[in-house]
Amino acid sequence: MWRAALLLAVSAVAPPTDPPSDPPLSDFALTPAPVGHERRFLDEVAAQLPDRLATERDALGSLIVRCGPPGAGDEPVRQLIAVGVDEPGYVVSQIREDGYLRVRALGAPTPPGDFHLLREGRPARVWTRDGACAGVLLVDSVHLRSPRPDVLGEEYMYLDVGADSPRGVAALGIALLDPVVQREVVGLLGGPVSAPAAARRAAALVMLRALRDVPEVADSAGLVFAFVAQSTVGTGPLGRGGEAVLRRLRPGEMLVLRGAAGLEEPVRGSSKLVESQGSHWRPVELRVAYADTPVEQVEPDDVEALFRALLQEVVYGEARADEAESAAVPPAEPEPQR
């Protein structure tokens, strides 16, 4: 009985099927994007882009948006603005005879030591072919379990979806390798938003807003935006997903939007370029609290500061570069008077 009541309470918080045209961050954070399963979220992003912008997907699923007038897609990529959209999670690795599910972590080969601990006893969702199914990541009964391990690994994790047999699991539409995610999103009116991967969602929303609402951005030839899938797996600033995008585009410069803990200022930029895959990149970082946890938190004013910083880089930075180039050309010598 308690399982059914808890699952009913969890299922009441369902992500909207039709996101608004200008979603607040708390709505934008509702759709998960676990590693290798980013398509549902990226489809939402693509649906909100202006029709005149050229979009494409690469082999790993990243969404690439080319700015500029029609026919400008063949121009060399002057600047790439990128954000990783994927997040850690689980997949269903086993369906037990008693209806419980075993899970395996997605993302980094060795998750942080508290990764599973922070998800223990929390509501979760299995994203099936037909939609989301509510569940709970189990906590062992205190009076029945053996001594608690020093590090809680995935071998101790079970997912309860309210079924008591494999047939009951199948009736819910759940299959092996379906992704399992947490989606507890809390947004206070005019205050901070707390959600898994909140900083990544904020950066993606800032990029979407710039593409949709600022003509100088959408009309800028040689400028490309990338919403990168599989960025938390592999090396480099955006993992193997970022490496694939760099090989495809060969930009002159890549700007990576990401969250960072411990910042005193809302946004921190860097003028130092780092080489990667034959291109150069630098970060623009958003202040975030409780980074890399299921309750990652960002402030709306900080997100607005990130939007202004992006415009400063993309729009006004280009203007300053043109002015600097003009100033570097010495003035012509006046002709002698006759």
Please identify what each model-predicted range represents.
Residues 1-5:
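Bacterial N-terminal signal peptides that target proteins for export
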Residues 6-338:
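N-terminal hydrophobic/helix-forming segments and targeting peptides
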